[in-house]
Amino acid sequence: MIRVAIIGYGNLGRGVEFALRQNPDMNLVGVFTRRAPETVETQGATAYHMDDLLVKKGEIDVCILCGGSATDLPVQTPEITQYFNTVDSFDTHAKIPEHFAKVDKIAKENKQVSVISTGWDPGLFSLNRLYAQSILPQGETYTFWGKGVSQGHSDALRRIDGIADATQYTIPNTEIIERLKAGEKLELTTRDKHLRECFIVLEAGADEVAIREEIVTMPNYFADYDTTIHVISQEELNKNHKAAPHGGTVLHTGVTNESTKQVIEYNLHLDSNPEFTASVLVAYARACVRLANENQFGAYTVFDIAPKYLSPIDVETLRKELL
């Protein structure tokens, strides 16, 4: 039985608790939080304060870290990896090499295993980009996200004066995807690949015209995209736009000779982004513990781990039933 601790209990931590119920070879030791444990409403797991984590060291095989990539994981993953095997979902792509190097050093010094940057992007999408480019080296890879809720863009909307609440959807340009699948070679801009759709609730007396202008001209978020804005009531937003669906496509178009076109496509359609991401983390937590049991200490990404380590099924059965 693999003994698991959840570190942090937001949407992702809650998703890990759900996922562990579907994996009978795993047991949840508890949730560890910086909040007062008695205020944390879990789905049944015992909540402890983070200060109690080291006290439980002998009862935990792996910690699944469920904090954010901006401020939590750059500190928590190296810190906790001094004492435990760890898995995180660090997703700041540009900083992954730096994060890996820091965690790898600590993991090797302390004889631990840490699997970083798991999830679906980075994670499963990363694997599919690697497979596609290795198999069809003469080609182009495209990644499309959505349709789904972007938490970062929704937060940016909510920071605008006059907006009481908001949800933003990232929508892939399906026409472009179909043209690429048909073999067209396209030079694509940011605006070509994705659309943005905003549902906003205005505060009383807010200037709708000014707010619309502020949204469509916001650099790094909306200025480079075709953006549609809907003003709705809080009731409608709560009813129709508070879920966390997401998904995306990795598309690789290539050739095996001058006249033979080949397309590799991988899709996700998710009703809950955090619950799916959590399920990926749990599978890689199993791999993490297995690598630790083999004394293969250090940091790993999805590129480094053989698929057999993810499955609860023994490799002989995998060869017989899945190969």
Task: Set out the residue ranges of the language-model regions.
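Oxidoreductase and adenylate-handling cofactor-binding alpha/beta cores
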Residues: 124-140, 155-165, 287
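General beta-strand structural signal in soluble alpha/beta enzymes
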Residues: 88-89, 114-118, 144, 167-168
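Rossmann-fold NAD(P) dinucleotide-binding segment
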Residues: 53-62, 70-89
